[in-house]
Regions:
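Short, intrinsically disordered N-terminal pre-domain segments
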Residues: 1-13
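Ser/Thr- (and often Asn-) enriched beta-sheet segments in non-cytosolic proteins
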Residues: 12-18, 50-52
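Proline-rich, low-complexity intrinsically disordered regions
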Residues: 18-20, 25
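Short, surface-exposed, charged amphipathic helix/loop patches that serve as local interaction elements
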Residues: 25-168
């Protein structure tokens, strides 16, 4: 077959998150795990909370973006976000020199991206430790862990939605 197809949106996998105290890994192991989803990339993960996620279809991803405000997001903010330097110091200086309306547009777009991530997780998260996910993601504490969990789950969701389980 010469054409490539997206994975089935019913595809599910179990993942853990690296902020879980039961997970042990170096920064390199963490990156390898996030890139591949291979639990063997982690030094240890026994007893970690397991998240069962499903792949999202293009329609699912589009609906998540719409619910997050795709039609009202700041286009100036989107352009600024794309143009932002990758070096942290350079980015800080660049951000400092933005006009007030540009800073507001960028902040608005970043808030939109956060809403997209939350919507993607709401649709894709099936279970947490074999229990229906419901609103459990909103009850993770501390807040810094909740944000990291969402961020890592989105990376896994995007990978399996676009590349499938073996996608690297």
């Amino acid at each position: 077959m010469a054409l490539s197809f997206l994975p089935d949106s019913e595809l599910t996998i179990e993942v853990v998150v690296t902020c879980d105290p039961a997970v042990t890994c170096s920064p390199e192991q963490m990156q390898a795990y996030l890139d591949t989803g291979e639990l063997s990339a982690l030094e240890a993960h026994e007893g970690a909370t397991r998240f069962k996620i499903k792949a999202l279809s293009p329609s699912d991803r589009e609906q998540a973006e719409v619910r997050a405000g795709a039609y009202t997001r700041s286009e100036l903010g989107r352009i600024l976000w794309l143009d932002a330097p990758s070096d942290e110091r350079e980015k800080a200086r660049w951000h400092h020199e933005l006009a007030e309306d540009e800073r507001e547009a960028l902040a608005s777009y970043q808030a939109y991206l956060s809403r997209v991530f939350v919507e993607m997780v709401r649709v894709a998260l099936v279970e947490i430790d074999d229990q229906p996910a419901g609103d459990m993601i909103d009850r993770i504490k501390p807040e810094s862990h909740r944000l990291q969990v969402i961020s890592e789950l989105v990376q896994h969701i995007q990978r399996i939605s676009l590349l499938g389980i073996s996608g690297k």
